[in-house]
Structures are given as C-alpha cells and as structure tokens.
Curated annotation (Swiss-Prot):
Role this protein plays: May act as a GTPase-activating protein for Rab family protein(s).
Record keyword Repressor present: no
Pfam families with a match to the protein in the record: RabGAP-TBC (PF00566)
Localization (cell): Cytoplasm
Name of the protein in question: TBC domain-containing protein C1952.17c
Domain spans labelled Rab-GAP TBC: 34-387
GO cellular-component term (any): cytosol
PROSITE patterns linked: TBC_RABGAP
Superkingdom to which the source organism belongs: Eukaryota
PANTHER family: TBC1 DOMAIN FAMILY MEMBER 13, TBC1 DOMAIN FAMILY MEMBER GTPASE-ACTIVATING PROTEIN
GO biological process: intracellular protein transport; vesicle-mediated transport
Organism: Schizosaccharomyces pombe (strain 972 / ATCC 24843) (Fission yeast)
Keyword tags: Cytoplasm, GTPase activation
GO MF term (any one): GTPase activator activity
C-alpha cells in the first residue's frame, strides 16, 4: 500500500469507535508510522500501554495520570523545602546539615542535589545537533526583577506549594484514590503559573549547585532557606541565566529526577536521558498539545513504560547475572550473530573484539546515539511494535520477554552490512568503526532485519539460520578487491625503497645488484594483472587473478566452504609472498649465527627455513 493508503489505514484504526486492535496496529507500526496527524504519539501511547484500547476512556486516563504527575512534582521537587522548614520549627535539633544518618532530611536534600547535578550535565549533552534541549526558556509569564521576590519568597507560615495551590485553586494531593470516578480536569487549569513555579525552584537548586562548586566551605554549609532569605530578589545574572535553561531541558530534568526518586532501587543512570529524548521529542512536536506541561506529564509515563522493558539493563546487581542483565543480553546477541554469519563471528573472536566494546551502548540506549534522530524515531516504531507483539503472543527468543528480539536482529544487520570493512581491518580500526556514528541507509538496514527475522522464525535448526551462506558471491569482485589492496601495498613499498638500499647477504656471499633485487616487481605485478610474467614464476602456475576470476559462483550446500578453503590458500600464498617482499626491500636485517639458505632458494616467493632477527618498517 502507498503512503496515503497507510495514513488512511492508521486513521481508521486509531479513530475506531470499537476497541483498537493492537495486533493490527503493531503490524502497521512495525513498517513505520507516517509523520502526520499526530499518529506516532497516539500509536506509541497505545503500544506502550499508556492509553487503553477503548477511546472513550482516553480523556479520563490522561487526566488521572497528569494529576498523579503533578502531585509527584509537588511532593518530590518542591515539597522538600517544607520538610526542612517543618523540621526546624518542630524544635528537633538532632538534624543538621552535617547529619549523615539515613533518616536525615538534610542528607536526603544533598543526595537529591547530586542527582540533579548529574541529570543536568547529561541533559545538556542530549541531542546536541538539534539544540532541542539547549533552547531558551519561553515561560508564559516571566517575573520581573522587582516582583520576583514575591514569587520566590519562602513563607515561614505557609508552604510554597500551598501558595501555588491557592493561586491555582488546586487541592494538594496526598494520595491517589484509584476508585475516584470523577478526576480533576487538569486540562482546564491554568498550568502557566505552576510551570513557572517549577521552573524557579528547579533553576534555583541547579544554580545553587553551580555556585557551591566554586564557593567556600562556609557557603556550602549554608541552608537553602538561608540562601533564599538572604536574597529576596534574583539578581541580573540569575535572570539572564533563566533564559539559558530551556523549557524542554527543564521538563526532561524533572522527569528524570522524579523517576529516580520513585525508583530508589535503580535511581538515575547515565543513558536514561537518551531513552527519554526521542519519547519527549515526539510528544513535544505534536501540535495537539495545549502546552508543554501536559506533554511533560505524558512523557513521564511513556518513559516509565519504556523503562519497564529495559530496566534490567540498568540494574547493577544484574550486570553479571547469567539469566538477566546486560551481559546476558550481549551473550545472546553473540550467539545469534554466530548463527547468521559464522565467518564474521569467527573473525571478531579471533581479533578478541568482545561485544562489550561496541554493543553495550547500542542496547542500553536503544541505538539512540548511533543514528540521526529521524532514523532513531523510525527504528523505534519497529522496536516498540515488536515488543508489543511479543507481549501479546508470548513468542520471543531473547530471554527478555521480547523486549530485545527486533533490536538484536537489527544489531546483527549492522554487523553484516559492515562485514567487509570489519573483515579487512585490524582490532583498533574495527573498534573505531563500530563505535562511530553509522553512515548506513536506515531502510536498507530495516529490510535486512526483516529478512533475518523471517529466517530465524522459519528455520528448523541453527544451520538453516545462516544468512550469509544463502547469498551468491561474485568472485570477480573478490579478486578485484584483493588486487586493489595488494596494489596499494605494492605502491607504498616501491615508493619507500631507498635508492642506496642493498639486499641482504648470505654468509660469505657478495651483495646482489640493486637491479636484481628489484626483479620481483614484474612478477609481483603480473601475478595481479593476470599477465604471464617474464620471470619469477613457474610455467603453468595459477596466479591470484586466474584463481579468483571465475564466473559468478552461486554457492550451494558446500560451496562457501570450498570458496573459503580456496581463499585461505591464496591469502596464505600472498602472505608468504608479501612477507618475503618486505624482508627483501625494507629491512635492516641482522643475520643470526644460524641460517640455512642455499643459493637456489634465495629467490622471492620460494619458502626457506631460516632464523633471522629482523627490524622491519611497519606499513
């Protein structure tokens, strides 16, 4: 179906009066969601089980979740100021800024500041190419320098949150009644003042962190209330800094901070900001939202639902678990690559390139750092849809309830797409390639992933899962590739030969002329070009090109094994040839006491047993 037909199909499903069919929605989404009519935001909410399938319940569910998030912000971000105030007014002097006991409110406050500091640093680095989280704040109503003291003053009698609640005619939430049938319609409330309040509090704590890093120990020990009371107005520098903290960045910081407070077992871990960024971006660019605060509320619960799928990867206690955690996932990924492409897996093993070196970030951040954001969003359409299908049908092979089935196949497709570059590179260059941003066409990778998925689901055994074996190989292309690489080596060697260099000498033998020493070049080049050499090779012996330059070989059951044996033999012959070449022209050789060389065996390309101590130039 074409693009317009897909849009109409999405509209029919999402606007249906009947309960939405999740299997049908997932089948559409796995092929990509059109970037129109807010389709992606609604589809992600449904597939992440944030919205129910019954459209009639959407409004009440959204209002309930937004009300819940608002209470979290009040209690966890703003309310700690009141906790410290009430503790001081109660006359309990046992708690103080230096108290390190677990029940100390001061210790909790400083721990929260450390979390905020780390979150702020990470968010500033998120999506740097788009500057999405680095924009200027555009608060609906900005306080002036003259009246800002009224907005941020800390009243010893009334709590700051209660003041905001009075302005909004909003009742403070102490608990969420699941049986409440008539939730507060938050969409009718003016959130601009509440958002402004959150902005000022969050900004004040972050600026305090920045000031503490350069202030004296005395200033660092001053209480938050003392700092705020001592400055009833925000100075010009703080006002200027207010514009530097963009609304999107502040919203992301609040989301991550609230999540860390609600999940103390896992807290905040670097990489969570990369999981949040695409989710928040999709909602923030949706034109159907009335204001950014509603987007922030929904993004928090979308992020929470996504973390349900990937939480095990962020649990430190599961890092080395044999059945859970990131190392278990990477081992499953390696096993799957071995089945798809044994030669590539073997090459990585021989070079000791462990998946930890390159795939750790792939899995923990869901490849959000490896591709441009539009490609990441398209990839997540398929990942989220595949996760939902696994939960619906209970079929998965990844050991994580299907959360990583599609992602593992996609990562295998990346390696298969880069296989030629990986096979010809050494350890360092391969690592550099795998850790860089990929300049690979996303549709091509997705199509390859779908092929791997189909192959895995229809294969009866591991041998049937071999993807590379089922493709035809053009040996002419292989020969040309080999020729180009060796010609490059040949030209480099020839260009670096000193004019006054001399060949190595046998014991009690005279030096050979320079012209004779260079006589290997015609044979070397003719063996690549398929031209019969004038010297240096036996008559009738096949050269590199004549062996590889055969008609296109459609590999049968044992075809690849035969080609591999043939290739190994040729590469070994070339290795001996180039090795002798290097020893012959680029060395400063020091002959050892024992050399078993005869005059008849001193020509290039003929094997000889010798013991030589060599200092070689590295090319």
């Amino acid at each position: 179906m074409d693009y317009k037909q897909r849009i109409e199909k999405f509209k029919d499903i999402l606007n249906s009066e009947e309960p939405i069919s999740l299997p049908g929605l997932c089948s559409l989404c796995i092929q990509g969601i059109p970037d129109e009519y807010s389709l992606r935001a609604k589809a992600w909410m449904l597939m992440l089980e944030f919205l129910p399938t019954d459209r009639s319940n959407w409004q009440s569910v959204l209002e309930k979740h937004r009300k819940t998030y608002t209470s979290f912000v009040q209690e966890l971000l703003i309310d700690p100021w009141r906790k410290l105030t009430l503790h001081e007014e109660s006359g309990e002097n046992s708690d103080h800024p230096l108290n390190t006991s677990d029940d100390s409110k001061w210790k909790e406050y400083f721990d929260d500041n450390q979390i905020l500091e780390q979150i702020d640093k990470d968010i500033r680095r998120t999506l740097p190419d788009l500057s999405f989280f680095q924009g200027k704040s555009e608060i609906n109503k900005k306080p002036s320098v003259n009246n800002v003291s009224e907005n941020i003053s800390v009243n010893t009698e009334d709590d700051k949150v209660e003041e905001v609640g009075q302005k909004l005619n909003y009742t403070k939430i102490t608990s969420i009644d699941q049986s409440q049938e008539t939730p507060v319609h938050l969409s009718t409330i003016d959130f601009s003042k509440f958002q402004e309040e959150c902005h000022l509090v969050l900004q004040g704590r972050i600026y305090r962190l920045e000031n503490e890093s350069t202030s004296s120990s005395t200033t660092a020990l001053s209480t938050p209330r003392q700092s705020m009371d001592s400055k009833r107005t925000i100075n010009a520098e703080a006002i200027a800094g207010e514009n530097k903290l963009g609304l999107h960045r502040e919203a992301a910081e609040r989301i991550l901070f609230i999540y860390a407070k609600l999940n103390p077992g896992i807290g905040y871990v670097q990489g969570m900001n990369e999981i949040l960024a695409p989710l928040y971006y999709v909602l923030a660019t949706d034109p159907t939202y009335e204001n950014y605060y509603l987007c922030e509320c929904d993004a928090f619960f979308l992020f929470t639902q996504m973390m349900v799928q990937v939480r095990d990867l962020y649990e430190k206690t599961l890092d080395h678990d044999s059945d859970h955690g990131i190392h278990f996932l990477m081992s499953k990924f390696t096993e799957r690559l071995k089945k798809y492409d044994y030669e590539l897996w073997e090459n990585l093993e021989e070079k000791q390139i462990h998946p930890t070196y390159y795939s750790f970030r792939w899995f923990t951040c869901l490849l959000s750092q490896e591709f441009p954001l539009p490609d990441v969003i398209r990839l997540w359409d398929s990942i989220i849809a595949d996760q939902m299908k696994a939960r619906l049908f209970g079929k998965n092979d990844d050991g994580f309830n299907g959360a990583y089935d599609f992602l593992m196949d996609f990562c295998c497709s990346i390696l298969i797409e880069l296989r030629e570059s990986i096979l010809e590179r050494n350890f360092a260059d391969s690592i550099k390639l795998l850790q860089a941003h990929f300049n690979v066409d996303m549709p091509k990778l997705l199509n390859l992933t779908f092929e791997l998925q189909h192959l895995r689901k229809t294969s009866k055994n591991d041998e049937d899962m071999s993807y590379v074996r089922k493709n035809s190989y053009n040996t002419n292309a292989l020969a040309n590739s080999l020729k180009n690489r060796v010609l490059s080596t040949y030209n480099t060697v020839k260009a670096n030969v000193p004019q006054s260099s001399s060949s190595y000498t046998d014991n009690n033998k005279q030096k050979e002329p320079l012209e004779e020493k260079r006589s290997f070049f015609p044979s070397f080049r003719s063996s690549l070009d398929g031209v019969s050499p004038t010297q240096g090779r036996k008559s009738g012996e096949e050269n590199i090109r004549t062996i590889f330059a055969k008609p296109t070989a459609h590999i049968g059951e044992n075809g690849w094994s035969n080609l591999k044996v043939k290739g190994s033999s040729i590469f070994q012959r070339f290795g001996n040839f180039v090795g002798d070449t290097m020893r012959y022209i680029t060395e400063e050789e020091e002959s050892s006491e024992e050399e078993d060389l005869t005059t008849s065996r001193r020509k290039i390309g003929i094997t000889s047993k010798r013991k030589v101590s060599v200092k070689r130039n590295v090319i």
